[in-house]
């Protein structure tokens, strides 16, 4: 089972709470996954899902909350690796039943977006978002890129969902994917907050564990890369120093150098892999890293002058 499916399975098993919250959650499930049929002054709501726990939740809420007749049917997929789909058929008795779910107004017209009456309180807003995620949401495995989304075919509903999420400061945005409107969250901290308040505590812990391990791996990689870069710089500098010392030795001889420069030059030739600090500790008296670096720069400057003189002589010859 994918991380997304496990998260939904956990959410679908949360026990029902207050009536207002249950109504908000059912309203989101019906609006996201349902279709309304009206014929001969009778109504039917068909809610289709591939998740058995979600289907059972819709069934329980519709039956226990509104006391409506409900049927549930399983459509078995014949193709391999295809999930079964479940259709929960709800039979609203009156227009008022549909109005309670925020689907129709008093005139029997379809209500756009999310009716305020459903999400007045914080607990209602949380319940509605949980229902919306159960119906049309998904979350990436935290081992990969961080991404949580809820998709809907209604632009007004997408904008309303985004605003509802951003009441909790979750940085939700809306984009288009073919004919679908995608409400998404990218920041890992915001995804963690969302999982927490909708009640996916087991998923939250797994997400956080993976995130911490990823951060540790990234930090170790950065340190290794930094140390490798520093080591490469040290090696390159040592190679350059040896080449310059040899140039001086072949041109004027190391004996022509002042004693402090000659001492460090001889040590560098003898210990080409040593760091500046290690070279300084070999001197008597000891010299700090900056002092050794200063002497090496003097030798580098002298080697460059000798190279320039050699070039001029070759040109003149």
UniProtKB/Swiss-Prot annotation:
Instruction: Give me the positions annotated for DNA binding.
Output: 275-308
- Short name of one Pfam family for this protein? WhiA_N
GO MF, one example: DNA binding
Which Gene Ontology BP annotations are present?
A: cell division; regulation of sporulation
Q: Which UniProt keywords apply?
A: Cell cycle, Cell division, DNA-binding
Similarity-based family: Belongs to the WhiA family.
What does this protein do, in the record's words? Involved in cell division and chromosome segregation.
What is the protein name given in its UniProt record? Probable cell division protein WhiA
């Amino acid at each position: 089972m994918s991380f997304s499916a496990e998260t939904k399975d956990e959410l679908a098993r949360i026990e029902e709470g207050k009536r207002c919250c249950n109504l908000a959650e059912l309203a989101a499930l019906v609006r996201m996954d349902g279709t309304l049929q009206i014929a001969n002054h009778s109504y039917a709501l068909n809610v289709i899902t591939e998740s058995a726990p979600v289907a059972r939740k819709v069934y329980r809420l519709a039956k226990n909350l509104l006391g409506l007749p409900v049927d549930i049917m399983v459509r078995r997929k014949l193709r391999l690796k295809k999930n079964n789909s479940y259709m929960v058929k709800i039979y609203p008795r009156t227009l008022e039943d549909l109005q309670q779910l925020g689907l129709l107004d008093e005139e029997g017209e379809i209500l756009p977006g999310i009716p305020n009456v459903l999400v007045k309180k914080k607990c209602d807003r949380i319940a509605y978002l949980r229902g919306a995620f159960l119906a049309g949401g998904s979350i990436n495995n935290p081992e990969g890129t961080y991404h949580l989304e809820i998709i809907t075919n209604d632009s007004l509903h997408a904008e309303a969902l985004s605003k509802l999420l951003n009441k909790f400061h979750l940085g939700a945005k809306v984009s288009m994917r073919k004919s679908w409107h995608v409400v998404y969250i990218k920041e890992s901290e915001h995804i963690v907050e969302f999982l927490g308040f909708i009640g996916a505590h087991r998923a939250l812990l797994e997400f956080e564990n993976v995130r911490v391990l990823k951060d540790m791996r990234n930090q170790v990689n950065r340190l290794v890369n930094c140390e490798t870069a520093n080591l490469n710089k040290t090696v390159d500098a040592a190679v350059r120093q040896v080449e310059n010392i040899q140039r001086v030795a072949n041109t004027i001889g190391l004996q022509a150098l002042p004693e402090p420069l000659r001492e460090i030059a001889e040590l560098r030739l003898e210990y080409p892999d040593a760091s500046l600090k290690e070279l300084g500790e070999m001197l008597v008296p000891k010299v700090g890293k900056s002092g050794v670096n200063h002497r090496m720069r003097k030798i580098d400057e002298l080697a460059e002058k000798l190279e320039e003189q050699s070039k001029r002589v070759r040109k003149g010859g």
